[in-house]
């Protein structure tokens, strides 16, 4: 526990080593008395993602982090589903081109897979599942899902974001996710929607 402006802060472990995700959540949840700490800062290694869905993997990650630290945990599992590919890369989005693949390698593999697919048939959906576990054996974890629909562009554009953002084109805005500002993206993205649901639950819980 730590104090912030007279408020006792409850430590919550975030089941990720991604500093961007930690900062994003830390700023948003501080107002609810939650002190977000990355699992890497507590010496927690990543859980093996053996689930078949985003929800299963998010729960696995949260339960692992909570069991090791004894703290409440939040986990995020996200990915991109392309309609014409039957929902691929899906839960394998981060390792689409291999276990150690870079964002660029994953992106290039997807562009190659869609090389002959015309406009109008390149619809895709980003999904984000956020899970909140009060403790490792929590029988009723809080689960929040956000989705974002767009199209896969024929080439990358923009330098912001990460992952598939440079080729995820949003027709309503006329730009890719990587061409948006952080605040603009958070207002419409899959992660932003899931975060808003989590924040709403915290307000009423």
Curated annotation (Swiss-Prot):
CDD domains: HAM1 (cd00515)
Pfam entry (one): Ham1p_like
Enzyme active site: 77
Family: Belongs to the HAM1 NTPase family.
EC number: 3.6.1.66
One Gene Ontology MF term: nucleotide binding
Cofactor note: Binds 1 Mg(2+) ion per subunit.
Gene3D superfamilies: 3.90.950.10
This protein's record includes keyword Nucleotide-binding: yes
Needed co-factor(s): Mg(2+)
Catalytic reaction annotation: XTP + H2O = XMP + diphosphate + H(+); dITP + H2O = dIMP + diphosphate + H(+); ITP + H2O = IMP + diphosphate + H(+)
Organism of derivation: Erwinia tasmaniensis (strain DSM 17950 / CFBP 7177 / CIP 109463 / NCPPB 4357 / Et1/99)
Protein name per UniProt: dITP/XTP pyrophosphatase
Function: Pyrophosphatase that catalyzes the hydrolysis of nucleoside triphosphates to their monophosphate derivatives, with a high preference for the non-canonical purine nucleotides XTP (xanthosine triphosphate), dITP (deoxyinosine triphosphate) and ITP. Seems to function as a house-cleaning enzyme that removes non-canonical purine nucleotides from the nucleotide pool, thus preventing their incorporation into DNA/RNA and avoiding chromosomal lesions.
The entry's keywords: Hydrolase, Magnesium, Metal-binding, Nucleotide metabolism, Nucleotide-binding
Residues binding Mg(2+), per UniProt: 48, 77
Residues binding substrate, per UniProt: 16-21, 78, 162-165, 185, 190-191
GO cellular component terms, A-Z: cytosol
GO biological process, one term: nucleotide metabolic process
Matching InterPro entries: dITP/XTP_pyrophosphatase, ITPase-like_fam, RdgB/HAM1
Subunit (UniProt): Homodimer.
């Amino acid at each position: 526990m730590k104090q912030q402006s007279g408020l006792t802060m409850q430590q919550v472990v975030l089941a990720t080593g991604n500093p961007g995700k930690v900062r994003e959540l830390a700023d948003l949840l501080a107002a609810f008395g939650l002190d977000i700490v990355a699992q890497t800062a507590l010496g927690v290694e990543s859980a093996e993602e053996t689930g078949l869905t985003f929800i299963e993997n998010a729960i696995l990650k949260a339960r692992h982090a909570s069991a090791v630290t004894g703290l409440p945990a939040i986990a995020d599992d996200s990915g991109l589903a392309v309609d014409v590919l039957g929902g691929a890369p899906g839960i394998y989005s981060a390792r689409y081109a291999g276990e150690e693949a870079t964002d660029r390698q994953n992106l290039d593999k997807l562009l190659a897979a869609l090389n002959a697919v015309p406009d109008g048939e390149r619809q895709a959906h980003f999904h984000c599942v956020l899970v909140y576990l009060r403790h490792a054996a929590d029988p009723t974890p809080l689960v929040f899902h956000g989705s974002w629909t767009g199209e896969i562009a024929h080439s990358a554009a923009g330098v912001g974001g990460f992952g598939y953002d440079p080729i995820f084109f949003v027709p309503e805005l006329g730009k890719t996710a990587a061409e948006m500002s952080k605040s603009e993206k958070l207002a419409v993205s899959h992660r932003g929607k899931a975060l808003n649901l989590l924040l709403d639950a915290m307000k009423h819980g």
